[in-house]
């Protein structure tokens, strides 16, 4: 009875029969891949049933004698070799064109082994979260600190730690492409591919290999969906779908233009003028900056330009701020004309200052040479000093002679006084003291 039921419903009881047989016949040290059907998850058993229903039921002669030991896992799908994701071969350009980039709509993990240089593409499983890191194409690290410690570490562990590179974010809109391409170029540089990226002049150091080209091709399409690319990028890829370097070269050129725009805005916001340079030079500088911004589709109004110029005026030009403070209709040409007028007036005044100073100095020299009392005395004193200058010995002789002569005269005067006094005594005359006589 049971044999008839088994013969009528072999598929419904295949799992239980397989479990009963394998539980008895499989030894304890069995291969971990040969798992019983009872231990498989439900979705695996469902997939096994679907595959068995699609295949044609073989005849009794084609069925092996011990058919319960056939592995339920399909032999065409190998087990995952690198973590959670199944390994696929690199998509060729023909397949990529035929699929219209449908294979690269989500970020992917592109890993390379320590001894393998060609990239491999991994399609993420929808049941697992997206990867957060992408190992670079080359395993060599430019960091000298890591190269010093490479002998003390295990090569496999070193590859896992050092070869993780943060991937760029996925492009979300056409307007964000200029920002996204900066992160993508940084990602390629961190992947040791900086020498094949065009520099600011559009030059590259070396030609890339096929593996490197495929790596750039795959990563670019993985993180930049085709429908979100700008029009100029689509035009390049329509001519040559794999010409990613041309896209990068033009992106670098556009980044330089954007940098120049930023520099022009900074220069315009930090304008300063005090008259040290000519007004014509200042006008040419400001007009060149405004014209360059206009060529990049950035229009600077006269009012904004006047406000930025007035903010940087100093010296004699500073009073123009008050003059333009109440004006609503500012004209850049009028402001330049007034700056030129003030500059010309200051220039004329500076030219007249040296002549006035020269006349004043000449007047001072004439007044010094004109005769006056002080200068006459000085001249006379100098003249006497020059004529009466005698040797020191002669001066001493003259002084001694004059003192001797004065001494002789004094003695003569004293003798006459004494004789007159004797005469007075002889006549018995009373004389008053000399003080009273006076």
UniProtKB/Swiss-Prot annotation:
The keyword Magnesium does not apply. GO terms for molecular function: RNA binding. Pfam families: TYA. Residues 295-397 are annotated as: RNA-binding. InterPro entries: TYA. One of its GO terms (biological process) is viral translational frameshifting. It is found in: Cytoplasm. GO terms for cellular component: cytoplasm. Keywords: Cytoplasm, Transposable element. It comes from the Eukaryota. Residues 1-88, 365-397, 419-438 are annotated as: Disordered. Residues 1-11, 19-39, 49-60 have a biased composition (Polar residues). Residues 369-382 have a biased composition (Low complexity). The keyword DNA repair does not apply. Coiled coil: none annotated. The record marks 397-398 as: Cleavage. Homotrimer. The C-terminal RNA-binding region of CA is sufficient for all its nucleocapsid-like chaperone activities. Retrotransposons are mobile genetic entities that are able to replicate via an RNA intermediate and a reverse transcription step. In contrast to retroviruses, retrotransposons are non-infectious, lack an envelope and remain intracellular. Ty2 retrotransposons belong to the copia elements (pseudoviridae). Capsid protein (CA) is the structural component of the virus-like particle (VLP), forming the shell that encapsulates the retrotransposons dimeric RNA genome. The particles are assembled from trimer-clustered units and there are holes in the capsid shells that allow for the diffusion of macromolecules. CA also has nucleocapsid-like chaperone activity, promoting primer tRNA(i)-Met annealing to the multipartite primer-binding site (PBS), dimerization of Ty2 RNA and initiation of reverse transcription. This is Transposon Ty2-C Gag polyprotein. It comes from Saccharomyces cerevisiae (strain ATCC 204508 / S288c). The gene is TY2A-C.
């Amino acid at each position: 009875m049971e044999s008839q039921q088994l013969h009528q419903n072999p598929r419904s009881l295949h799992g239980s029969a397989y479990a009963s047989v394998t539980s008895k016949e499989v030894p304890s040290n069995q291969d971990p891949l040969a798992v019983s059907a009872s231990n498989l998850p439900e979705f695996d058993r469902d997939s096994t049933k679907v595959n068995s229903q699609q295949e044609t039921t073989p005849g009794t002669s084609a069925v092996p004698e011990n058919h319960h030991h056939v592995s339920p896992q399909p032999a065409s799908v190998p087990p995952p070799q690198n973590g959670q994701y199944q390994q696929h071969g690199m998509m060729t350009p023909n397949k990529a064109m035929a699929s219209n980039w449908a294979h690269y709509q989500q970020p992917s993990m592109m890993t390379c082994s320590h001894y393998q240089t060609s990239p491999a593409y991994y399609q993420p499983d929808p049941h697992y979260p997206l990867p957060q890191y992408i190992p670079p194409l080359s395993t060599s690290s430019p960091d000298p600190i890591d190269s010093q410690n490479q002998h003390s570490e295990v090569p496999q562990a070193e590859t896992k730690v050092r070869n993780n590179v943060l991937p760029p974010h996925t492009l979300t809109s056409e307007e964000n492409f200029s920002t996204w391409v900066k992160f993508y170029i940084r990602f390629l540089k961190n992947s040791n591919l900086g020498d094949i990226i065009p520099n600011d002049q559009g030059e590259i150091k070396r030609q890339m290999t096929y593996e490197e080209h495929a790596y750039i091709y795959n990563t670019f399409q993985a993180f930049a969906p085709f429908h979100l690319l700008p029009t100029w990028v689509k035009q390049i890829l329509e001519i040559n779908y794999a010409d990613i370097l041309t896209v990068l070269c033009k992106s670098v050129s556009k980044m330089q233009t954007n940098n120049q725009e930023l520099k022009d805005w900074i220069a315009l916001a930090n304008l300063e003028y005090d008259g040290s340079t000519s007004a014509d030079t200042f006008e040419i500088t400001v007009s060149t900056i405004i014209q360059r911004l206009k060529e990049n589709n950035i229009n600077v109004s006269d009012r904004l330009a006047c406000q930025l110029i007035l903010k940087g005026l100093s010296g004699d030009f500073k009073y123009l701020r008050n003059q333009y403070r109440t004006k609503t209709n500012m004209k850049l040409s009028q402001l330049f004309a007034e700056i030129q007028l003030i500059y010309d007036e200051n220039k004329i005044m500076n030219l007249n200052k040296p002549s006035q100073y020269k006349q004043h100095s000449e007047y001072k020299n004439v007044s010094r040479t004109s005769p006056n009392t002080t200068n006459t005395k000085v001249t006379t004193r100098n003249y006497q000093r020059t004529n009466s200058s005698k040797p020191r010995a002669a001066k001493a002789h003259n002084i001694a002679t004059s003192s001797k002569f004065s001494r002789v005269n004094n003695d003569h005067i004293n003798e006459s006084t004494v004789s007159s006094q004797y005469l007075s005594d002889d006549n018995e005359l009373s004389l008053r003291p000399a003080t009273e006589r006076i």
